[in-house]
């Protein structure tokens, strides 16, 4: 009994030690002191070793508060508040790479009054500098910053002064003001943001600010060379900004320097003043104003992006105005662009005005982008695509002495005011629309573009949004109809919000109740008896849900047709393009693969479709526009699949931070349609919700996709054939191990296998592996595997543009650039690999002994698989022998690779040592021969060789 009592007492002591937490200011002081001395903080941790607040903390006694100097643990405020705190710096001076701080609320009774004295300075209520993760923190306190003479940069933010890693789900409601004087040096600036003042870091650090909002007013006055004032982040640098919104008023007053110079520039943005990384799905409601004795670049979303990047799916609702005494650029989305920035799918509703002075140089005002220019050093131009302006645009005379024919005049445009590029670069302002009023007291104005030089223009924005309405009394918040052009309802068509599926009624109507906080689209599963609506080659079976819509209605008008029983599908894998001028990938996609596919399509008498199996671009998100432009040259409906390289490679924590590019440029990431008798399912099997940059993405289906797949297939009878198309095969992929590549470890494997295992047949197509591969489970279950199902066949397709980063006419396995051609005859399916520049008969390359150097004939049969015959060697029309499987390196590719001297890229495109090679020793004295092989569909291919 005594031992039992001792053990119980010890356990109770441990529980108390692990569960104490921080419940008072004295506890907080003790915790901070222990941190700063490097002592144990276990007594303030819970059982998960997380430091926790257990109550609101009254900070009234904190007269000379000393913050945590450096924190590498996990701190959870559990939504408790810090109250009555008169701060001079943040709670944490620095959160390290391993640090996590969450759930702290700074009460409105708190204030931060910071004074810097010339040195580099950082201040934010939660952290002065963040190298770790801050999430779920809220600030209501006021921040006031002053600096009498800045010699170095100052960074002030509501949550963090500076961010190098991640800030998620944080809010600022407190007013932030900064008044700075200093030296007039270009490198000295003040950066102020509602969430973070500044950001930095290389792209590999995956720095991000996401799902954050600011409602606090921001006011900056300075006489420095640069002011950065942003609703979310001042100078975001390498921090990407996603799913953020600003409702706070932002004003910047940039004054002349001590020597009277007015060369300073105010950069002001509703989301960021300046950025070197992407901004997606961000929204500004706040009024923006730039004034003072200097000029400004001011935009509803960002003042000036300063790198090759994408700004997409953003909306500005707030008024944006520049009224300084020097030339300025004003835009509803972006003030000025001088880099290969791609602005896509953005909308402006705000009033845009230039009311400043611009006597000797150009000033601009426009609904989307004020000014686009192209420095001599640039290798690519800017794109503005699929953007719409509804706001009024105006500019005063500004004392400008030039007329509209002069580039230094004031320019005003509904979409872009002034756009200039070089004739040797691609640049465009295309597929954009304006219905706002455009007025200019002097200079030049245009309904869409004020002036364009060496810039491609034309087209109108897609009408692909549902209409925002109020919910119905029963809570229904998505509804509409599917009809023919004469108004006849189409019954039985499946409609989805990406999770649930419903069928249209007899009159073509449908309705559902959806979680609009995470619903991006309402779309159709296209039946085989309607024409697929396309725009520039892409199916338009969807409507985008408007931002902040409480409910939405979407009507679809379709044209009926007889279902096609016979047709062809081009299975194109991994174009994996980078922008023009990088590594020839875009060039090969443009000048070899796409033209070949279009020529093949044109030679066909029946319907042709294309399914592009992911890795459409290669990490560089601003390649999307050009990829799509080239894909549209294949004049048939093209169904796109998302791959791992189609994600922003900095994606962390949630898939939605990375797939937003695909959704913006293409549409839903999972969807279905019928062609003839077959049901096609497009899936995202790449799970990019990794917890850190050191983790890899995973394979499988996320919860939302699985829910949708179950709903979609509930309307598909089991006697149908299913064609699953994804980037990574959900079942079997090439692997040296017989049992190591069945993907049973993938997320939700058992669930999605159960959904498809009883269908008549399932063909699972994929890219990703950069090689041709076939596997039929019916030949293996019960023999060498227990996974999969006997109705499943897996087909992998080689990279269309050749070896990665090399992009030459043949790939690392010796296969020509190319794609699979799938022939469909009712329910009968066959396929073959079509090399670029070759016909169906070209299925192998045969090398003579003189070429191989070992007295043997070798044949590389790049699409050979189970079900094919053993290749046979013929001499003088007589079979001599079966050839032996001898995997090895393709001689032609080996020689081609030897000419490649890019040491950085060579490791990505080494000759494959396991090419599908067969060999035979010819009869002595033979002068020629022939290799014959028959594929699984009974097609015999021959190739002759001179010995």
Stretch-by-stretch model annotation:
Residues 477, 484, 526-624:
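N-terminal active-site segment of His-dependent metallophosphoesterases
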Residues 779, 783-864, 869-872, 915-923, ...:
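Binuclear metal-dependent phosphoesterase catalytic core
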Residues 469-491:
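Structural motif
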Residues 527-535, 539-550, 621-717, 742-763, ...:
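Extended active-site neighborhood of metal-dependent phosphoesterases/phosphodiesterases
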Residues 890-919:
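Aromatic sugar-binding surface patches on proteins
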Residues 496-515, 885:
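Short, acidic Ser/Thr/Gly-rich low-complexity loop/linker segments typical of extracellular
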Residues 493-497, 522, 871-873:
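Hydrophobic beta-strand segments
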Residues 20-468:
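Surface-exposed repetitive/solenoidal architectures
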């Amino acid at each position: 009994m005594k031992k039992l009592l001792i053990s119980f007492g010890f356990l109770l002591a441990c529980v108390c030690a692990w569960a104490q937490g921080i419940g008072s200011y004295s506890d907080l002081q003790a915790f901070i002191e222990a941190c700063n001395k490097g002592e144990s903080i276990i007594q303030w941790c819970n059982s998960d070793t997380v430091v926790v607040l257990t109550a609101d903390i009254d900070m009234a006694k904190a007269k000379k508060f000393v913050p945590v100097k450096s924190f590498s643990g996990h701190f959870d405020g559990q939504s408790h508040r810090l109250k009555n705190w008169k701060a001079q710096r943040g709670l944490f001076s620095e959160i390290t790479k391993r640090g996590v701080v969450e759930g702290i609320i700074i009460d409105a009774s708190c204030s931060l009054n910071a004074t810097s004295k010339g040195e580099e300075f950082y201040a934010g209520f939660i952290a002065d500098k963040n190298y770790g993760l801050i999430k779920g923190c809220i600030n209501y306190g006021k921040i006031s910053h002053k600096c009498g003479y800045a010699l170095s940069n100052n960074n002030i933010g509501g949550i963090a002064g500076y961010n190098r890693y991640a800030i998620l789900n944080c809010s600022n409601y407190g007013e932030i003001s900064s008044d700075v004087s200093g030296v007039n040096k270009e490198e000295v600036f003040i950066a102020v943001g509602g969430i973070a003042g500044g950001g930095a870091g290389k792209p590999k650090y995956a720095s991000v600010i996401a799902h954050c909002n600011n409602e606090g007013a921001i006011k900056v006055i300075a006489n420095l060379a640069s002011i950065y004032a942003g609703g979310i982040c001042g100078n975001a640098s390498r921090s990407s900004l996603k799913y953020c919104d600003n409702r706070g008023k932002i004003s910047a007053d940039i004054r002349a320097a001590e020597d009277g110079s007015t060369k300073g520039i105010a950069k002001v943005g509703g989301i960021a003043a300046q950025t070197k990384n992407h901004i997606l799905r961000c929204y500004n409601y706040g009024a923006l104003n730039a004034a003072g004795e200097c000029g400004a670049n001011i935009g509803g979303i960002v003042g000036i992006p300063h790198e090759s990047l994408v700004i997409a799916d953003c909306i500005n609702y707030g008024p944006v105005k520049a009224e300084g005494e020097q030339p300025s650029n004003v835009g509803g989305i972006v003030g000025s662009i001088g880099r290969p920035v791609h602005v896509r799918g953005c909308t402006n509703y705000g009033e845009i005005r230039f009311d400043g002075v611009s006597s000797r140089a150009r000033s601009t005002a426009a609904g989307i982008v004020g000014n686009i220019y192209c420095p001599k050093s640039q290798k690519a131009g800017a794109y503005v695509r699929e953007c719409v302006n509804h706001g009024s645009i105006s500019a005063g005379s500004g004392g400008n002495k030039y007329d509209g024919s002069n580039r230094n005049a004031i320019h005003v445009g509904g979409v872009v005011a002034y756009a200039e590029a070089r004739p040797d670069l691609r640049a465009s302002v295309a597929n954009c629309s304006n219905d706002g009023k455009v007025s200019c007291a002097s200079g030049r104005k245009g309904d869409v573009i004020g002036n364009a030089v060496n810039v491609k223009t034309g087209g109108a924005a897609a009408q692909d949004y549902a209409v925002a309405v109020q919910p119905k009394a029963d809570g229904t918040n998505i509804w509409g109809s599917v009809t023919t052009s004469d108004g006849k309802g189409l019954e039985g068509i499946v409609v989805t919000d990406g999770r649930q599926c419903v069928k249209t009624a007899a009159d073509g109507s449908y309705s559902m109740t959806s979680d609009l906080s995470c619903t991006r689209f309402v779309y159709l599963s296209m039946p085989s008896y309607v024409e697929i609506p396309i725009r520039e080659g892409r199916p338009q079976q969807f409507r985008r849900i408007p931002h902040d819509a409480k409910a939405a209605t979407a009507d679809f008008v379709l044209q009926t047709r007889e279902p096609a029983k016979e047709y062809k599908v081009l299975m194109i894998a991994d174009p994996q393009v980078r922008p023009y001028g990088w590594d020839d990938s875009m060039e090969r996609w443009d000048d070899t693969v796409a033209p070949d596919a279009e020529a093949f399509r044109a030679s066909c008498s029946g319907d042709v479709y294309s399914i592009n199996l992911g890795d459409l671009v290669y990490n560089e998100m601003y390649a999307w526009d050009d990829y799509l432009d080239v894909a549209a040259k294949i004049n048939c409906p093209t169904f796109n699949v998302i791959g791992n390289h189609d994600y922003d490679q900095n994606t962390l924590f949630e898939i939605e931070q990375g797939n937003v590019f695909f959704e913006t440029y293409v549409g839903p990431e999972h969807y279905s349609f019928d062609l003839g008798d077959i049901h096609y399912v497009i899936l995202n099997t790449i799970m990019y919700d990794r917890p850190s940059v050191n983790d890899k993405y995973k394979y499988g289906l996320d919860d939302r996709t699985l829910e949708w797949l179950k709903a979609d297939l509930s309307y598909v009878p089991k006697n149908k054939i299913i064609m699953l198309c994804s980037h990574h095969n959900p079942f079997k992929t090439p692997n040296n191990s017989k049992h190591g590549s069945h993907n049973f470890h993938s997320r939700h494997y058992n669930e999605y296998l159960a959904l498809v295992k009883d269908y008549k047949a399932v063909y699972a197509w994929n890219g990703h592996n950069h090689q041709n591969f076939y596997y039929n489970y019916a030949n293996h279950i019960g023999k060498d595997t227990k996974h999969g199902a006997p109705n499943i066949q897996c087909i992998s397709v080689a990279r269309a543009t050749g070896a990665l980063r090399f992009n030459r006419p043949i790939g690392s396995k010796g296969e020509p650039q190319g794609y699979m051609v799938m022939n469909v005859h009712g329910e009968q399916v066959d396929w073959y690999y079509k090399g670029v520049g070759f016909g169906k008969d070209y299925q192998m390359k045969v090398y003579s002994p003189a070429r191989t150097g070992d007295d043997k004939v070798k044949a590389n049969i790049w699409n050979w698989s189970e079900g094919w015959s053993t290749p046979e060697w013929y001499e003088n029309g007589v079979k001599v022998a079966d050839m032996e499987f001898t995997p090895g390196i393709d001689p032609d590719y080996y020689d081609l690779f030897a000419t490649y001297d890019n040491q950085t890229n060579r490791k990505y495109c080494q000759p494959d040592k396991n090419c599908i090679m067969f060999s035979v020793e010819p009869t002595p004295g033979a002068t020629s021969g022939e290799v014959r092989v028959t594929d699984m569909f009974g097609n015999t291919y021959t190739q002759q060789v001179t010995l």
